[in-house]
From Swiss-Prot:
It comes from Mus musculus. GO terms for molecular function: ATP binding; monosaccharide binding; protein serine kinase activity; protein serine/threonine kinase activity. Belongs to the protein kinase superfamily. Alpha-type protein kinase family. ALPK subfamily. Pfam families: Alpha_kinase. Serine/threonine-protein kinase activity is stimulated upon ADP-D-glycero-beta-D-manno-heptose (ADP-Heptose)-binding. GO terms for biological process: cilium assembly; cytoplasmic pattern recognition receptor signaling pathway; innate immune response; positive regulation of canonical NF-kappaB signal transduction; response to bacterium. This is Alpha-protein kinase 1. Serine/threonine-protein kinase that detects bacterial pathogen-associated molecular pattern metabolites (PAMPs) and initiates an innate immune response, a critical step for pathogen elimination and engagement of adaptive immunity. Specifically recognizes and binds ADP-D-glycero-beta-D-manno-heptose (ADP-Heptose), a potent PAMP present in all Gram-negative and some Gram-positive bacteria. ADP-Heptose-binding stimulates its kinase activity to phosphorylate and activate TIFA, triggering pro-inflammatory NF-kappa-B signaling. CDD domains: Alpha_kinase_ALPK1. The gene is Alpk1.
Length: 1231
């Protein structure tokens, strides 16, 4: 009966019965009563006893027989999971029968009893729905704390950290109070608090806050030991988590933790090295839970990993290396022996742990004996198993999952055969660990006594603040009395920023319109009004982005419902920032998630939204670009031309006029096809001409994350500068050739022109630089140098959005016309739109822009400064005064070469139309090493592929890791050494998805400034199906053996435009630096009793390997589910309507002061709570630093000037409370 589909089907049926009973309550039939009695009688006596005790609320967690006993009899050594598994079918039948007779107390007890077992089967979401249904039907039904905490665990696994934090903090603050549950004694409340503290520690571990996580796990151990009978299971779990944290913790943090006067763990005193302490902790953890195989497996896996890592470290004496490797070998073998060959494994967590043990053992054999045939065979088997595990996780049917589970365990058995795993003698046949592990059980775990309640008091500020942020009453209370103390219950789910109370939301999801009305009628008027306001605020988002309202299910985002046109969002004012974030609002796909959109058929939005009539320009433009018949294009283009004169497609004169999907998603570059100065208006999809030159209408379509230029509905050619589609593969070889694409189009007079794209691009007078300007791009880049010819060409070609006269405003107040392109490219202060990108310094998109001239040799030249103009930063403006903070700027983060293109976009203030032409022969020049601008733009600035004289063989040698390289990486290397070692590795092609790879996991510690590697296996899965398209990178699911959370979800990111390895490592180093700064910032907030904490999601690197040769590189971070918002970019734009922005700007100010005036963290984006307080999770920062000028998004001095004079023009309350010192204008100009 342990079939997931069958279990899920019965639970779904139970939920449907509860939904019907919620609408009407019929009399209980005699047949139903008889069935209920029959089902109860069919249960084994042990299960009947457990159900009775659960109804009586005898314990908050279903206990194991051995959990609280020191002396055990043979019957105490059984595993409760085996008992539940054997009677699962009868329990499910009893659950359904209890619901039919409306015995919610009995049904709730059965849910409680099955909870842990079904969590192992990966069907907790369905069971939690039943628990909520029971509570909705009869709010007085007691729901066990274990079930409420399960909700928190599932939330952590699925990425809903805000929700999990609320549930846990509420239980801790309210002494475990939840709904109508009654505790039998005070020690049960301590147990619940200890478990909650433990899970909070796991959340901080997930966020990479190693020291803080270790403190919480230590606190949970204190709680378990405070009980009248110590909880051996809880202690075992906490010791295992603590050991896992020690693996990632720096030596500095470990020494600090070890020497802390309040931390009194005995094992810390016995070992000097954190990895040896971790290994010993795992040995104890396995011994404490010797009768539960999964607990033993997890503990010995961590022990083996610790010993393996220590054997590779520089601290391990050479003579002890083989000793520790043998101890690691023993640990992994113990784990593999927790299941017999042919024994069924049902859950993802256990399967993952077995593969990890097999891989760990393979790695140990490799270190001890080298790359033998057995090692190579075992490694291949582990890789196959990881691939099957990913398929297992995503398989829709239980039959497939059961077959895959058997195949995975068969592969594990083969690994055991290749590596000759033998069973060990054991006196206790029920125990899964050898007798040698049990000798440490008698030793003291703690020195001295610590008061658990005092420990909780130190965290009370955090728990209270989280509860205040999400304060709500039970959604089912008929009186909804607001003066009663708020306690978490199974339906109190108001913890997401983009949904209303999910009690109502979940009910709406499963019921008809009538049922929704009925449920709504049960709410108070105040709650109904509140719900309406919430719906009103989120209406725009809900049309374009639909997320599962059942916040307990591990669901991905659903596709948008295009049946409503997809353009309802366009009817909102540009200034209406409460309904959705501005950069998502303009596109019609409101941003509710951080990951970049792939596989997005934007044309569907355009086609189905083209019927809108409220804004004729948008509707007409949409049709013209996407699906207008050829015969109508000429007249349509004339109409659009007249409509678009004087109108900026980025910022309109009418606040209520918003850009169409085609304008924002189908941005076509202005393509001069020949020397006749023809240019294409990107937003309108038409060509404005001069001197009677031919005109061409182009359209741009997006499919699977790649852009394609469409000349007609059937004639297309692909823009090869963007990432290829999922189905297509990058050109083979180290450097792929640029394919020659045929084009075929007709001008407006019906004359057909043909040729190759390469011929067009490399014409005698103009170089074709195909790239689209995406207002939702991520980050702008910067260099101190001027512009390369191709980059100037790219920027100039992208700029003509409104066909208006271009002028350049300089800090000294001078104005220069843009048609001076014969000698260079002048740029100006852009009138900005709400999608402000993070820009690069090269083109200087914003106020302090410089003219870049190009010499005859094709080299870029920075313009000469005018007299009186400072090179340090802008000091004066056109109107003679510093502008106020800009709120309407392009809001995404801009990359190198994009800033210039954005700068050259039309100004809203332009009053006349004047097309301009690029005639400089410099634009047709190739790069100095013979590359065309096309191929230069198709790679990174730092692409080693363009280095003259570098051969493929040299690149291949640089990518191959020698044994000495691997040894150093495993021991830990500094950032500069790593970058130097990877310097000549060239530009890697895109990673191959849908398969498993060998990999090196590299973690960076800002405190030690070391990168430490770990061998692993990773499966690169499907692209994320999300609604926010990123400019730079694609995001896809990954699952790797050494991820922090076995059941957690992780996302990999790779650049769409292939780049060198330096970019990936610099990105992670920057994010972990921001995390280091924010940790110190949080301490200052806590000291001042400010109820907010900011976290940066940790990021790591996975180097994809094939026989020790680097084949790819991705960055990886935990998946966070919730509403994704962007608070600022890396130049001047900031969204002050979010309360979180106040804290973010204060954090940026703090980072400047904490770094001794050298760094400012900017480009704030992530997940915030509804009121912007409590908890803020951020990702993908940029840092303006005076030290690292090799990063193109780092503006250095000018970036710091932007921050203090535009984004953070005056200090806020947080700055004052933290006593931050504000630099003067002169200081920021001379940083």
């Amino acid at each position: 009966m342990n079939n997931q589909d069958a279990v899920a089907s019965i639970l779904h049926e139970c939920k449907q019965v509860l939904d019907r009973l919620l609408l009407e309550t019929p009399d209980v039939s005699t047949e139903d009563k008889s069935e209920d009695q029959r089902c109860r009688a069919s249960l084994p006596s042990e299960l009947r006893t457990l159900i009775q005790e659960a109804e009586e609320m005898k314990w908050p967690f279903v206990p194991e027989k051995w959990q609280y006993k020191q002396a055990m009899s043979p019957e105490d050594k059984t595993n409760l999971q085996d008992v539940i598994g054997a009677g699962l079918q009868q329990l499910l039948a009893a659950l359904r029968a209890s619901i039919l007779v409306q015995d919610c107390a009995a049904a709730s007890a059965i849910v409680f009893l099955m909870d842990r077992f079904l969590y192992g089967l990966d069907v907790s979401g369905k069971l939690l729905q039943v628990a909520k249904g029971l509570h909705k039907l009869k709010p007085a039904t007691p729901i066990a704390p274990q079930v409420v905490i399960r909700q928190a665990r599932v939330s952590v696994n699925s990425g809903k950290l805000l929700k999990a934090e609320y549930i846990l903090s509420s239980l801790i603050s309210n002494n475990g109070a939840t709904g109508t549950w009654l505790y039998r004694n005070e020690s049960d409340k301590v147990l619940v608090q200890s478990v909650c503290i433990q899970i909070r520690g796991q959340i901080l571990q997930k966020l990479g806050m190693w020291y803080e996580a270790a403190e919480l796990i230590w606190a949970s151990v204190i709680g378990y030991l405070t009980l009248p009978q110590p909880d051996k299971k809880g202690i075992s779990t906490s010791l295992g988590i603590l050991a896992d944290i020690f693996v990632s913790m720096s030596k500095t943090d470990y020494e600090k933790f070890k020497k802390s006067p309040k931390v009194n763990l005995a094992l810390l005193k016995e070992f000097d090295h954190h990895l040896l302490s971790a290994a010993e902790a795992c040995k104890l953890a396995a011994a404490f839970s010797a009768y539960t195989p999964l607990f033993v497996l997890r503990a010995v896996n961590i022990r083996g990993t610790c010993l393996l890592s220590y054997s590779c470290s520089a601290d391990c004496p050479p003579g002890m290396k083989s000793v520790h490797l043998c101890e690691a070998k023993e640990a992994f073998e113990i784990g593999l022996l927790t299941k017999k060959d042919g024994e069924l494994v049902s859950g993802k967590q256990e399967l993952h742990s077995f593969i990890k043990a097999a891989f760990g053992l393979t790695t140990v054999h490799s270190r001890l004996h080298g790359e033998t045939d057995a090692v190579r065979a075992a490694r291949q088997l582990c890789s196959e198993a990881v691939g099957k595990l990913y398929t297992f996780s995503t398989s829709p049917t239980s039959q497939d999952r059961e077959g895959l589970s058997q195949e995975i365990m068969s592969l594990i058995s083969q690994v055991k055969g290749h590596l000759r795993v033998q069973s060990f003698p054991n006196l206790d046949v029920c125990s899964y660990v050898p007798e040698s592990f049990k000798c440490g059980l008698d030793r003291l775990i703690l020195h001295g006594h610590v008061d658990f309640q005092q420990i909780l008091e130190t965290y009370s500020q955090h728990h209270t603040s989280v509860c205040e942020v999400f304060e709500s009453t039970c959604g089912n209370s008929k009186s909804n009395q607001r003066d009663t103390k708020s306690e978490v219950c199974i339906t109190t789910l108001k913890t997401e920023t983009n949904t209303a109370d999910t009690m109502v939301a979940t009910l709406e999801r499963v019921s008809s319109q009538d049922s929704r009305s009925t449920a709504s009628s049960k709410m108070s008027k105040k709650d109904q009004g509140k719900l309406q306001r919430e719906r009103g605020r989120s209406w725009t988002r809900s049309k374009a982005f639909r997320v599962s309202l059942d916040l307990d299910m591990e669901t991905e985002t659903e596709p948008p419902n295009h049946s409503n046109g997809g353009t309802d969002v366009f009817n909102k004012s540009l200034r209406d920032n409460s309904s959705s974030c501005s950069w998502g609002r303009l596109s019609g796909l409101s941003s509710s998630t951080s990951w970049e959109e792939v596989n997005c058929a934007v044309q569907d939005v355009v086609r189905k939204g083209s019927g809108q009539e409220k804004h004729p320009v948008e509707a007409q433009s949409s049709e013209a670009v996407s699906e207008e018949p050829k015969r109508n294009r000429s007249s349509r283009a004339v109409f659009l031309s007249s409509k678009l004169r004087g109108v900026s497609l980025q910022t309109t004169g009418d606040d209520n006029l918003e850009s169409s999907p085609s304008q924002l998603h189908n941005h076509t570059s202005i393509l001069p096809f020949n020397a006749k100065d023809t240019c294409l208006a990107s937003g309108a999809g038409l060509v404005e001409t001069a001197e009677g030159s031919n005109n061409t209408s182009l359209q741009s379509s997006h499919s699977c994350g790649s852009d394609s230029w469409s000349l007609s509905s059937s004639d297309r050619f692909t823009d090869v500068t963007t990432n290829p589609s999922v189905q297509e593969e990058e050109p083979s070889g180290i450097m792929g050739d640029v394919p020659e694409s045929k084009y075929d189009f007709k001008d407006w007079h019906g004359e057909k022109n043909g040729g190759t794209l390469t011929e067009i691009c490399t014409g005698p007078e103009l170089t074709f630089a195909p790239s689209s300007v995406d207002p939702e791009g991520e980050t702008a880049e910067s260099t101190d140098d001027g512009l390369s010819p191709s980059q100037v060409a790219l920027g100039c070609l992208e700029g003509s959005h409104s066909m208006s006269t271009r002028r350049t405003f300089f800090p000294d107040g001078s104005v220069q016309n843009a048609d001076s392109a014969k000698t260079g490219c002048s740029v100006r202060d852009q009138t900005v739109d709400p999608d402000a990108s993070t820009v690069d310094e090269e083109g200087q998109m914003l106020d302090s822009t410089e003219v870049c001239s190009i010499g005859q040799d094709g080299a870029h030249r920075p313009r000469a400064l005018r007299s009186g103009q400072s090179a340090e930063g802008p000091k004066s403006f056109v109107n003679g005064s510093r502008p106020s903070p800009i709120f309407d700027e392009d809001f995404s983060t801009t990359e190198e070469g994009e800033e210039l293109g954005s700068m050259l976009k039309s100004s809203q203030n332009s009053s006349s139309y004047s097309p301009w032409w690029l005639k400089s022969p410099a634009f047709s020049r190739s790069s100095s090493d013979g590359e065309s601008s096309w191929s230069l733009l198709n790679s990174s600035r730092s692409s080693f592929a363009s280095l003259a004289g570098q051969t493929s063989q040299e690149i291949l040698e640089a990518r191959t890791l020698q044994p000495d390289d691997l040894e150093k990486l495993l021991a830990g290397v500094r950032h500069d050494w790593l970058l130097q070692r990877l310097e000549n590795t060239g530009v890697l092609k895109s990673n191959q998805l849908q398969q498993a790879h060998s990999a090196l996991l590299l973690k960076y510690s800002k405190k030690s400034e070391l990168w430490t590697a770990q061998e692993t296996v990773v499966y690169l899965g499907d692209y994320l199906k999300v609604k926010k398209k990123g400019k730079q990178r694609n995001a896809f699911w990954v699952h790797y053996l050494h991820q922090e959370e076995t059941l957690g979800r992780y996302v990999g990111k790779e650049y769409k435009e292939r780049k060198g390895l330096r970019h990936h490592f610099t990105d992670v180093e920057r994010q972990m630096t921001a995390q280091h700064y924010v940790t110190e910032f949080n301490k200052r907030l806590y000291e001042q009793k400010i109820p907010t904490q900011i976290f940066y999601v940790p990021s790591t690197i996975l180097l994809i390997l094939e026989d020790r040769t680097i084949k790819g590189c991705i960055s990886v971070e935990p998946y966070i589910l919730g509403e994704f918002v962007k608070l600022s970019n890396n130049t001047k734009v900031v969204k002050n309507e979010y309360k979180a922005t106040e804290y973010g700007l204060a954090y940026g100010h703090f980072s400047y002061e904490f770094s001794n005036h050298r760094d400012v963290v900017v480009d704030l984006q992530g997940w915030v709570t509804g009121n912007g307080k409590g908890l803020i999770y951020l990702t993908d920062p940029q840092i303006h630093s005076v030290d690292q000028k090799d990063v193109t998004t780092n503006f250095g001095k000018r970036g710091i000037f932007y921050f203090f004079n535009n984004q953070h023009a005056s200090c806020n309350e947080i700055c004052h409370r933290l006593s931050l010192t504000r630099p003067s204008l002169e200081q920021t100009s001379k940083v």
